[in-house]
Amino acid sequence: MTQDLNSYFKELGCDYWYEYDKVYGDLDVKDKVVIQVGGDCGSSAIYFVMKGAKRVIFYESDPNLVEKFRKDVCSWFDCSRIEARGKWDGKDYPDGDIFTIDCEGCEVSLDFSAIRKYQICLVSVHNWIPYEGWAKLIPNLVNWKLVYGSRDSKELTFRSPW
């Protein structure tokens, strides 16, 4: 690949690569299974595999982005350790080690008791969710560590305290 990864994914319309070291850089994903809600075109799944993840399962509700992952991204990268699934229903918590959710609005469907099974969880909260969503999320995020705020301050990512 002749261009850097940030430019590659930006040209695909998946302009988040620049965030990954800030959000996920301190995660030890080596030989771990990462479950990800909000996979976009698979750029973060590629990031995790490049950092040594054993396997990544990601959910993405936009079929065009899943197709872009399969057609474009996998033509450049080895995607054999990545499974792309469709829309997350808020009830599916596959076995794994690390759980991340960065899916606009999906965070309000999160079952905080279900994610306790993972070693580490990252939850991204978006400022455009309705008040009722915030009211549900905030009590569950007490004692979680704020690890990232987006450039536009419209998204905050929290890491589980366990």
Language model segments and positions:
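Conserved acidic-Pro-Pro-aromatic motif
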Residues: 96-162
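Hydrophobic alpha-helical context, especially transmembrane and signal-peptide helices
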Residues: 4-6, 29, 33, 144-146
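Short loop/turn elements that flank and shape the SAM/SAH-binding pocket of Class I
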Residues: 88-92, 106-107
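Intrinsically disordered, low-complexity N-terminal regions enriched in serine/proline/glycine
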Residues: 7, 15-19, 92, 117, ...
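SAM cofactor-binding core of SAM-dependent methyltransferases
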Residues: 10-90
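Rossmann-like AdoMet
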Residues: 1-11
